[in-house]
């Protein structure tokens, strides 16, 4: 029997958001194997996802690298794919539909658009709404696309909690990728000092940096959570967020994790996008939005934290 391929290269936040859709696709194709094509940094994490039968790594080398593209094409042919759910909907995956995984049924933004509808307009809708519409167009029931269950992605972190907190804690993510510096609020160090002062050190302030963020984290006057002097893995990261009393973050992957774990917290937004478009707000997890993140004061953020924590 032929198999199903889902494409979602990343980022971490995008993969978290796609988790419900992946579950819906697997539930719909119970008797078929479902594989995920993704980027290498997420392959180990997603290989533990119970809704997948396997993970295929795409190194996403330049398209002029014909040797790599031929190798990828030959590899995918061996999986006997009959349908592709393109949840990445990028120029790269559009290229794949034409030259790498041809002659199979594709579900993508382009196959979802209504008559006369432009992709640029469609892409303004909330991401989970778009995912739901795309799956429904293929007849897939969407019980979990907007009801994401991350219970499979947690692990026992009692050892780390004993080392760094031992009780309730506030978890901060003041980081963002190098290419998305406009998402970064510049006053986290000052905020940490004010939280400690205002709450009289009631809550340890924890930071969980990625490998390239450890030096930055060490300058922020919080407790830097490491595992054997290395950044924690994704399941440990999710578990730290899950156990936190409150989460404060830039618009990054951990924000989406906190949202879908229904944690109390704040995500700080500038004008780069909207909270609605990335489907991040809920009853407990709220966005503070300003035109320019440099204009968002420590006092405003602290006031919101106090009102939500008390």
Where are these regions (language model features)?
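Active-site donor-nucleotide binding/catalytic segment of nucleotide-sugar enzymes
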Residues: 149-216
């Amino acid at each position: 029997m032929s198999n199903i391929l889902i494409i979602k290269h990343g980022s971490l936040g995008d993969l978290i958001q796609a988790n419900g859709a992946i579950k819906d696709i697997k539930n719909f194709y119970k008797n078929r194997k479902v594989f995920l094509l993704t980027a290498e940094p997420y392959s180990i994490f997603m290989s533990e996802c119970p809704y997948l039968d396997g993970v295929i790594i795409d190194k996403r080398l330049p398209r002029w690298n014909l040797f790599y593209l031929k190798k990828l094409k030959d590899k995918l042919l061996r999986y006997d794919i009959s349908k592709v759910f393109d949840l990445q909907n990028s120029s790269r995956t559009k290229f794949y539909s034409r030259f790498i995984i041809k002659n199979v049924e594709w579900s993508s933004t382009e196959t979802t658009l209504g008559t006369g509808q432009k992709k640029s307009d469609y892409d303004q809708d909330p991401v989970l709404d778009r995912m739901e519409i795309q799956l429904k167009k293929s007849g897939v029931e969407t019980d979990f696309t907007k009801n994401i269950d991350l219970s499979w992605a947690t692990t026992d972190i009692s050892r780390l909690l004993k080392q760094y907190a031992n009780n309730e804690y506030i978890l901060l993510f003041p980081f963002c990728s190098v290419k998305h510096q406009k998402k970064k609020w510049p006053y986290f160090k000052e905020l940490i000092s004010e939280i400690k002062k205002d709450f009289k050190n009631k809550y340890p302030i924890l930071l969980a940096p990625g490998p390239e963020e450890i030096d930055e984290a060490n300058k922020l006057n919080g407790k830097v959570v490491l595992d054997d002097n290395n950044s924690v893995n994704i399941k440990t990261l999710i578990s730290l967020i899950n156990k936190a009393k409150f989460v404060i973050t830039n618009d990054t992957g951990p924000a989406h994790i906190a949202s879908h774990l229904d944690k109390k917290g704040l995500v700080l937004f500038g004008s780069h996008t909207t909270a609605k478009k990335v489907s991040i707000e809920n009853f407990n997890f709220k966005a503070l939005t300003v035109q320019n993140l440099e204009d968002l004061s420590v006092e405003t953020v602290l006031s919101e934290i106090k009102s939500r924590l008390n």
